[in-house]
Every structure is written in structure tokens, then in C-alpha cells.
From Swiss-Prot:
Protein name: Probable dipeptidase B
Major enzyme class: hydrolase
Domain of life of the organism encoding this protein: Bacteria
Keywords in alphabetical order: Dipeptidase, Hydrolase, Protease
Amino acid sequence: MINKKISLGVLSILTAFSLQSVSYACTGFIIGKDLTKDGSLLXGRTEDLEPHHNKNFIVRLAKDNPAGEKWKDLSNGFEYPLPEHSYRYSAIPDVTPNKGVYDEAGFNECGVSMSATVSASANDAIQKIDPYVKNGLAESSMASVILPSVKTAREGVALIAKIVTEKGAAEGNIVTLADKDGIWYMEILSGHQYVAIKFPDDKYAVFPNTFYLGHVDFNDKENTIASEDVEKVAKKAKSYIEVDGKFHIAKSYNPPLNDANRSRSFSGIKSLDPDSKVTYKDSNYELLQSTDKTFSLEDAMKLQRNRFEGLDLKPLDQMALDGKGKPKSKKAVKGYAYPISNPNVMEAHIFQLKKDIPAELGGGVMWLSIGSPRNAPYLPYLGNISRTYEAYQEKSTQYNDKSWYWTVSHINDLVAAHPKPFGTKVIDEIKGLEKTWIAEQDKTTKEISDLVVSDPKAAQEKADKISLDRAEKTFKRLKAIEAKLVKEKPKNKKGLNRS
């Protein structure tokens, strides 16, 4: 068993980082199918909160619910009736359900995929008119209530809208839901206001923790779902803003753009399109971005691992500190910013959705990194799996050598603490594994897609076996990498190993 410790220096960096970024969590993205090299729709999110926060990956099986049974969120008191029958779905929950389940993302058996949420918050003027509701719908309940209940992405958006209208929202959030017909992007703006759009196939978007919707045609009922008073509330709050004579949602509902959202919006757009005209000084970044470039799954992975490569910025967690967790100089702070790939990332997921993949398989593949993908792999999972590897299910809140999350967390800590000796050795090997899996996945998906037509049970068993075998083999390799890093890490002046 490896004795896991974090050196004082690393702890100071992480502490300073956490204090400066306590309200910054998650970065989402969407790449429309017309902008991808293989015609797939790409969408995903990094889930950020804090270092050393265990995440599981599980499948919640289908079940019938007794009449009157309710979902109960122990973190804020929200309750909602369960459907008569709950569909099977995959989930990425926390391990402390009394503080919120946070199922976060997954496929359900009907082919609906969901990522929930990117947190955001309305400005003070809006909140005075339509405040958030303490026991309303929150991120902690979102996927757990929606995924087992809906057959289409639009149904999911409509159910969220119904709940927010009737019971209120506990917080501002951005949610994405997708199926074979495309992807919906939804902003829950205030206590009872929301706007959702069917995302265009020829656009891309990067969205950290602020609202992004500009002008939306509320009369386009086929592609828009919105609360009735979204404009009225902004006018009443006296925060209503028009651009080119039209109501601009983000400018009306947002507080001023903060540096962490600026840095991730800017670097995310530039990661995908270095020729984009956006600048670091922009006061607002529009949701719908255009480009003449096309993108691959690897580009999406690169986006979620972005640490300002090619830009005149350095990651905030690399600041020189004074020994007390504070920057040595304000001049240094000016050159540093908050990256998409930061120490607070707990997991990252990418949905790769294709028209020719049956809904029974989720309509695509979820590429999942439990733990930050900075030095950890994305593994592919189809939507029909019924089981996950045991290392994904360890519930410890501190280091556990049998846990996937804690193993990856330790590897990331070691590489971050010792960049000179370890360099890019780990991530280079990880990318090699991913390249192999990407090359193999189309063949695997085709075989299981063909099988599901004639024998759904056999298709599920095959998907389970392939994913379990891959996860087991990969976890053994991660344990070997971890052990090698521990053995090779530099020693301090007293000859003791530092972690």
C-alpha cells in the first residue's frame, strides 16, 4: 500500500488556488456535427470543485417505483415525485449523498445523454426580483431526476422547465441534453426563468460559469423553450439590455465577467480555433461561435486538458508563492490565469454522438476520465452497459489504493509536484492508449450495434465485457505508473521521499 502524502509546498499551492477559485466550477463545450471530421456531435464538461474529491462511475438500473415515492435531495430538501418506472442510466456521483448525490452525466436506456451542470449566477438586480429558491432544483438532483424519467432530450428540457416553473431553481445552471435528433443547451437563469435552444449543427461553444445566450427567437417553438417572463424580469430588475435592437439574455442576466470565466472562455475558443478574433480583453463572449475548421475527438480532449498552450498566459496553480499560500508579487499575478485544466477538476466527460449508433446504445460513446484528465485516460463507454469496474465504485473520502479516482489523483499530484523529472512521460503514454482505443472503437460499436438488433441482452453482455476488461487492464497500468512515480520521485535534503 502506498503511503499518500502531499508536500507542504503542493498543499500551499492547492490551498491558494482553491481560495482564489472557490466559486469557479466546470467548463462545458459543444461542437456541432457539421464541424467535426467524422460527422459526430461532440459535447462534454469538466466537473470542477476541489482537489481530492472522490467521484464514482456507476449504472443505476431500471426499476418500478411505488405510487407516491419521491426523489429527496438531502442537501437542500428538494423533493419530486418519481416516475412509475425509472429508466436505467449511467451516472458519475459523489460519495457523500447527504451533501448531494451529483449524478452529473450519463446515458439513459432510451438514448438520452445529459451533462449537468455548469454553475452560473444571475446578477444581484435579477436575484432581487426572482431569487433562487433554497429547496428548489439544484445540480445535486438534476441528472438523478431527469435521466430516469425521459425518452428524448426535448422531454428532458421540458421537464426541467416544468420543475423550475413549479418549484423554482436553487441556483443558476447550464445543462445540455442530447439524443439522435441533436443537442439542447439550457440556461436556468434565476429562480423561475430559463431559456433553452436546440444547438445549431454548424456552431461550436465553450461555456464556463456564466450565461452566454444572446438574442433568442422566442417565437421559434420548435427550437426554443423559454419561461414566459424572462424579458419581463430583466426589465423589472432594470438590467434589461438590447444589442442591435434585440433583447440580449446574457448581458441582461449576468454580473460583470470575472477573470476565471474570461480566461476559460478565451482559451477554450482559441484552443479549438487559434484564428478566432476573440481577445482576452473582451467584455462578453457569445455562445455561438463560427469557424471554417473541423474538429476531432482528440481536439475535444485537448480542449479539456488546456493549460494556455500557445497563449501568453500561465496557469494560476504555477504561481510563485511566499510560503504562506499567497503570490510573491502582484506582477506575477498579472501573468497568470485560471485554466480549463486545473487542480479542481474531479472528472471529465465527452459525448461522441453519431446518427448510425442505435438509441439502445445511447446513440454514441461517452469518453470518461475519472479524476483530472491532465495525467489520466479517457475510456470509451456505450450507453447500454449495466456494470462498471469495481475501482470506479470505491467510496472512500481519502486515499484508497483500490480506488480509480484516488489513484489518478495521486498520479496527478506527483507529476504536478515534480514537473522536471516527470515531464510529460505519463500523459504521453496515456495519449498513446487513447489513440489505440479511438482506432478500435468504431469496430466495437459496429459489432454491438449489429448485435443489439437481434439480441439486446447479448449486446449488453458484450459491451459490459469489453468495457470491464479494458478498465481492469488500464487500472493495473495506472497502479504501475503510480508505483513507478513514487519510487522515482526526488528526495528532500534529509533523504526522505517527498510526495
